[in-house]
UniProtKB/Swiss-Prot annotation, chain B:
The modification Phosphoserine is found at S989. Residues 306-332 are annotated as: Disordered. Keywords: Cytoplasm, Exonuclease, Exosome, Hydrolase, Magnesium, Nuclease, Phosphoprotein, RNA-binding. This is DIS3-like exonuclease 1. GO terms for biological process: RNA catabolic process; RNA processing; rRNA catabolic process. Pfam families: OB_Dis3, RNB, Rrp44_CSD1, Rrp44_S1.
């Protein structure tokens, strides 16, 4: 017997309605050594992002790009992040793919042409995985990049969405992801409405795509308001401590 | 706004390790309470159904009560029931999907006054489970806490009764809060519903059967059956291909031994199996019941068994194909049941003698279900003696591995055995047809039309609708005496010389609002049920016979489809769909219309609308009408020809006839003469259906309701080809066109019955036409094989088919979509529509089955009291249409009966026919070959029966206490039965209808004798008298009726 992901009354397993996000809490500037850092909790998904740069190219100089900065992303997830303990925290195929996706996302958002021949490192670590890890990583990294003071076009806000019984569900939890339905990950630049990255798992009829996309975008805009609040608060705290 | 909590679950994995799972749990300040007493309805967002306002208290069942007594809570008399989410989840997790779905449907059903309260998502109601607290205790605590909150939420204005089975809880909470009472369920029924006897009985019987089960599980005697495997193992096994999933289909004639598993979906492709899987014996069947979705493990090839082709005890149809008995087929055994298909069963208690022989435990009684395919059920009751002469409804509770038979409990009494009303009720229950009279709430929604307060066309509607009352000559053609006229026709010449053809259908959706009580009821019924002597309407008679019926001379709302046709080529130029107001000028009947068409005007006196007029205006009116009918026929011929040309077919007696028959009233007891007018009307309806199908599909490509008729499987035609070959005909079954052509040519001039039988076999090989939702099917599959149309739907009979109501709503939505107006109708999504289609298809099959069973019931009652030996009418002429190892299957055209006749009886004596045509039983042997069977006696005499031979048979009734009676046939002679010529025409007119009439009359007489008023509607019988003479058409229709049913029997599995 499969779980009832959406009850007749419109509740999901954890008590949310279809379009509601999980609780989001975030903090910027968690580490002093790094140029920028941030920590985010989306429900029970917890992620830590650290940014170094922009700095000179490390390693082989040949990787340097003449016209823009190189964005280097690394994703890892803690061995204790999932229900059953993982073997290796990074370097597996899934982590590599996630790293590439993050890179793609941030190349689209960071104004890389301002820093030619330099490198920006983004390290993301997932401490607890409960669905929507990609979204949590992007959101954490956005805050970290801002904390590092690297110019961006806009926030990048990400959120996942699924589709159950003709209804689009925003911000899937692990239980909902594991049920095996279609799942869409969207990274949005909210001000312009441009899409930085869109990814889809499993099949979905094209007629429903628009609906799911809209749900994800709506959720991403919701994430944006929250992140915006966090940034403003952080800036305020920072300016108070500077004594302005 | 939301508050986050965390729930920690400890699960055990397959490997036996414990897994700690943390789930989030969000609480909100308000969830819909669905109470009319709610102080802040806006905050609660009560938009669904509300509890009734006039109840004296609310009742909140504990989780255990919901699990065990859901059937009692289903009584519509129990009002103000609040199901807590905690209790629903307990049902979902511990009682399985079936029970949970029942609960869900109950909550959705507008007729039941119950709601769900999502207490676990409400911040004040949610209680986290404490460390070390038992699940059960927590559930009860949580439900009580929510009940208290609910009481305060309604500002203490409505007392709340929480019913629980937990004595401790009653002790603990009983007097904790004023206004919230905690009592036991039994106590509740006694105090609050002392008069609801049915509920008490049901409650007692559930209680008793549960007690039995408990004591039984303590006794540990040897297991009768192997245990079912756990669900995970089954699912993994199905995925890996080790097990096969399918639906269990018990052989009616050898219910003890033989069952087949029809493969389900993808598994058939993977395993490479074509045929069904045989399940041999009740051990291998392992407690699964007919219709269950089971998981099967294949046995090694060495253990495979063959099916039997011999005629069994009760063999009356010809389903088993002609395989020889020795040929082994894939055989398996059931290892688990995925979904139980238990429903209500009609059973008979054993008679007194049998009870005594059952002996030691008199309280547990084995009852025999009416349906052969269901095993005997063990019932615990003290009323066994009182119930022995009745048909009784029971439900199965459980079937433990330790018990040979399933345990059940008694639900209600239907009626006496052998009593007409009781038997009809049996047929209804067995087909899960529930036709309670329409309730008051439903009737309140109906418009009024009384002489004091006549119904009128409202001015608002007059503005919105196109008014055809003065501009168009609208008329209807129906069988005589028909009262639910749902279609009318019109034709006229436009100013530009083109023709305008119009089909106007009763606008039922105007009166039946979506999701109103009446709509819900109609949806559940899905169709009007026609039994042999009565019918159960889908809509109340105020609609079906009055306001929606397009009677002559009165204003009625209609939905119209109008085509502009080219004046000469009849090419369709334009089409218009919309709501209209019409006034039908004539309500013609078929015979009259045909007479007018043929230019025979003497019929005028039979047309009431013309009779009253003076000569001159009569003449003018008549000319107008005759022109319209003539034109209509001409157009219909053209359309028909075009359809034929498009690779279509002339497949007599398949869908065209069904269509025609379906079109108006399937009081199939009024078989129609094959007049051309029938065809004309049918063709116009097909055209309308086709165009509406196109329209709704274009507007709603993923949620339109259409009707498909898949092409038949070639393998099914093999029997037909074999039979035809016996007579020297060749049947080409490659396409519908060739099939129709070769059937036409397969005509034996000496015996017209041969052709009819071949056609009925062809019909049998066809798949059934089905409703479906366009979103769930590829476009190529929309095709309608029988009509050779790419898209088809049902639009023309909304009075008696729910599918047509859905199509009407779709069409209305499509029109407003075209006009860029907002769509008022709330349409079904693809998923819901698909579910609805399944329901309607299911109900249609039930309707057909019940119709067939009721016909058989009447046949049996007709022959029951006659002495087969002496009475002349029990002897009839029959045709052999199939050969088996120990007998033949015979069709008797005079009564439309199909049945088996044995050539070898129980004592292994075979039949032998003397030269003068008399027959007797003698020792000997039988020899069967492809198309003949030879019976040789020990003395050396032999008789040969060929396929399509005419024989004389004697009809008698085999009475049965527990099941329906059956007709038994006995071959009297191998010569055709000769009816004395003078009697021929008189005799042969005895059709099913006459038979029904006679039976009903005798029943009525019996009832009158007891001074009980016969409930059967007399007027219906007047109409049966109209049938005169036996036409081949009617004959074919009858064969088809039975044939189609046989097929549907197998499809229903």
């Amino acid at each position: 017997a499969g779980l009832e992901l959406l009850s007749d009354q419109g509740y999901r397993i954890d008590g949310r309605r279809a379009g509601e996000l999980r609780k989001i809490q975030a903090r910027m500037g968690v580490f002093a050594q790094a140029d920028g850092s941030a920590y985010i909790e989306q429900g029970n998904t917890k992620a830590l992002a650290v940014v170094y740069g922009p700095h000179e190219i490390r390693g082989s100089r040949s990787r340097a790009l003449p016209d823009r900065a190189l964005v280097n992303c690394q994703y890892s997830s803690a061995t204790f992040s999932t229900g059953e303990r993982k073997r290796r925290p990074h370097g597996d195929r899934k982590s590599c793919e996630m790293g590439l996706q993050l890179r793609q996302t941030f190349e689209a958002a960071i104004l890389t042409q301002l820093h030619p021949r330099s490198q920006i490192d983004i390290y993301v670590q997932v401490l607890q995985a409960d669905g929507g890890t990609y979204a949590a990583c992007v959101n954490a990294a956005t805050l970290a990049v801002m904390d590092a003071g690297i110019p961006m076009r806009d926030f990048v806000c990400a959120c996942s969405a699924g589709f159950v019984d003709g209804t689009a569900l925003a911000d899937l939890s692990h239980v909902e992801e594991a049920a095996g339905g279609p799942q869409l990950a969207l990274a949005l630049l909210p001000a312009s409405g441009q899409i930085a990255l869109l990814e889809m798992d499993s099949r979905l009829h094209e007629d429903h795509l628009e609906q799911v996309l809209e749900a994800a975008a709506q959720a991403a805009r919701g994430v944006h308001t929250l992140l915006d609040l966090v940034v403003r608060q952080h800036v305020q705290e920072a300016s108070v401590s500077l004594g302005d | 706004m939301l508050q986050k909590r965390e729930k920690v679950l400890l699960l055990r994995t397959f490997q036996g390790r414990t897994l700690r799972i943390v789930r989030e749990h969000y609480l909100r300040p308000s969830v819909p309470c669905n109470s009319p007493l709610c102080p802040q309805p806006a905050a609660c967002r009560n938009d669904g159904k509300l509890l009734a306002a006039e109840v004296t208290h609310y009742v909140i069942p504990d989780w255990k009560v919901v699990q065990d007594y859901l059937e009692v809570l289903e009584f519509p008399e129990l009002k103000g029931v609040i199901f807590m989410q905690t209790a629903c989840q307990a049902v979902q997790h511990q009682r399985g999907r079936r029970q949970y779905n029942k609960l869900r449907n109950l909550l959705k059903d507008a007729r039941h006054d119950c709601v769900l309260f999502a207490n676990e998502f409400q911040q004040h109601c949610y209680l986290p489970r404490e460390k070390g607290e038992a699940m059960e205790k927590w559930q009860t605590r949580s439900i009580y806490n929510s009940a208290v909150w609910y009481y305060h939420h309604c500002e203490d204005r409505m007392p709340i009764v929480m019913v629980t089975e937990d004595e401790e809880a009653i002790q603990k909470y009983g007097s904790e809060t004023e206004g919230v009472f905690v009592i036991s369920f039994k106590n509740y029924l006694d105090n609050f519903w002392p008069d609801l006897k049915a509920a008490h009985d049901l409650c007692d019987s559930i209680l008793q059967s549960r007690r039995e089960r408990e004591t039984e599980s303590q006794e540990t005697h040897g297991k009768e059956y192997p245990e079912h495997l756990p669900l995970e193992v089954l699912e993994a096994g199905i995925k890996s291909g080790r097990y096969i999933q399918g639906i269990l289909n018990v052989n009616k004639h050898r219910a003890q031994i033989e069952a087949f598993v029809r493969l389900h979906g993808a598994s058939s492709k993977d395993s490479g199996l074509v045929s069904d899987i045989l399940i041999h014996g009740s051990k291998a069947r392992n407690r699964s019941i007919h219709g269950d979705v089971v998981v099967v493990e294949m046995l090694p090839k060495s253990e495979w068994k063959g099916r039997t082709a011999a005629l069994g005890e009760n063999d009356s149809d010809d389903k088993a194909s002609g395989e020889s008995p020795s040929e082994p087929m894939p055989t398996g055994r059931v290892v688990g049941i995925l979904q139980k298909n238990w429903r209500d069963y009609v059973v008979t208690f054993p008679s007194k003698e049998e009870v005594q022989s059952q002996g030691k435990n008199a309280q547990k009684i084995l009852v025999t279900p009416w349906d052969y395919r269901i095993p005997k059920i063990r019932i615990s009751t003290q009323q066994a003696e009182a119930l022995q002469d009745f048909r009784v409804v029971v439900r199965i509770d459980s079937w433990e591995a330790t018990s040979v038979y399933p345990n059940g409990h008694f639900v209600r009494v239907l009626g006496r055995i052998g009593d007409l009303e009781g038997e009809i009720a049996t047929i209804l229950v067995e087909n899960s047809i529930s036709v309670v009279p329409f309730s008051e709430a439903q009737m309140c929604e109906m418009p009024v039309n009384t002489p004091e307060n006549p119904w009128k066309v409202s001015p608002k509607e007059e503005q919105e609708r196109k008014d055809l009352r003065t501009t168009h000559l609208v008329f209807s053609i129906d069988p005589k005496g028909c009262e639910d006229v749902d279609d009318t026709l019109s034709v006229r010449t436009l100013n530009n010389g083109n023709l305008e053809l119009g089909v106007h259908i009763a606008d039922v959706t105007h009166f039946v609002a979506p999701n109103s009580y009446i709509d819900v009821e109609a949806r559940t019924r899905a169709t009007t049920y026609y039994l042999a002597d009565r019918r159960y309407d889908m809509l109340p008679s105020i609609l079906s016979a009055d306001l929606c019926s397009l009677l002559g001379g009165v204003d009625r709302y209609a939905v119209s489809v109008m085509w502009e046709l080219d004046k000469t080529s009849y090419e369709i130029k334009k089409v218009w769909y919309g709501r209209t107001i019409i006034r039908s000028a004539y309500k013609l009947f078929y015979e009259a219309a045909q007479e007018l068409l043929d230019g025979n005007f003497s019929i005028v006196d039979d047309i009431p609308e013309l009779k009253a007029l003076d000569k001159q205006s009569q003449q003018a009116k008549l000319e107008e009408l005759v022109w319209a009918i003539g034109k209509l026929t001409d157009i219909a011929r053209h359309i028909r020809a075009k359809r034929d040309r498009c690779g279509a077919l002339e497949l007599e007696g398949v869908e065209v006839r069904v269509q025609l028959d379906d079109k108006k009233n399937i009081r199939d007891l009024i078989p129609k003469q094959p007049l051309e007018v029938h065809e004309t009307v049918a063709e116009c309806m097909i055209l309308a259906n086709h165009w509406v199908a196109k329209k709704i599909w274009e507007s709603f490509p993923h949620q339109a309701l259409l009707r498909q008729h898949p092409p038949p499987h070639q393998e099914f035609f093999s029997e037909l080809r074999e039979c035809a070959k016996a007579k020297g005909f060749f049947i080409d079954t490659r396409s519908n066109k060739t099939l129709a052509d070769s059937l036409d040519s397969a005509n034996d001039p000496k015996d017209p019955l041969v052709n009819k039988l071949l056609r009925s076999m062809a019909t049998q090989a066809m798949s059934n036409a089905l409703y479906f939702s366009t979103g769930s099917c590829a476009e190529e599959e929309f095709h309608h094989y029988g009509l050779a149309l790419d898209k088809y739907t049902h639009f023309t009979s909304p009075i008696r088919r729910y599918s047509d109501i859905v199509v009407h709503r779709l069409l209305m939505a499509a029109i407003s979509k075209d006009k860029k107006m907002e769509i008022k109708e709330n349409l079904f999504s693809n998923k819901n529509l698909e579910e609805l289609c399944r329901h309607i298809n299911n109900r249609n099959r039930a309707a057909q089955r019940s119709q067939k069973q009721s016909t058989e019931l009447f046949q049996c009652m007709y022959f029951k009291d006659r002495d087969a030996e002496t009475e002349e009418r029990c002897i009839a002429d029959g045709v052999i249409y199939s050969i088996r190892t120990n007998g033949v299957l015979v069709f008797i055209p005079r009564f439309g009966i199909k049945g088996a006749a044995y050539l070898k009886n129980k004592d292994s004596l075979v039949i032998s026919c003397g030269p003068e045509g008399s027959s007797e039983w003698k020792p000997g042997s039988l020899q069967r070959s492809q198309n003949k069977i030879i019976s040789t006696t020990a003395g050396g005499q032999s008789v040969t029966f060929h396929l399509f031979d005419h024989v004389t048979v004697r009809i008698s009734v085999q009475a049965s206490r527990c099941h329906s009676d059956t007709i038994r046939l006995e071959i009297v002679s191998n010569k055709p039965y000769m009816i004395p010529n003078t009697e021929l025409c008189h005799q042969s007119s005895l059709l099913k209808s006459e038979l029904v009439k006679e039976v009903t009359r005798s029943v009525e007489e019996a009832q009158l004798a007891q001074e009980v008023k016969g409930k059967v509607i007399q007027e219906e019988h007047q109409e049966y008298c109209q049938t005169k003479g036996r036409s081949l058409y009617t004959l074919l229709e009858e064969i088809r009726d039975l044939a189609l049913l046989d097929v549907s029997d197998s499809c229903a599995m």
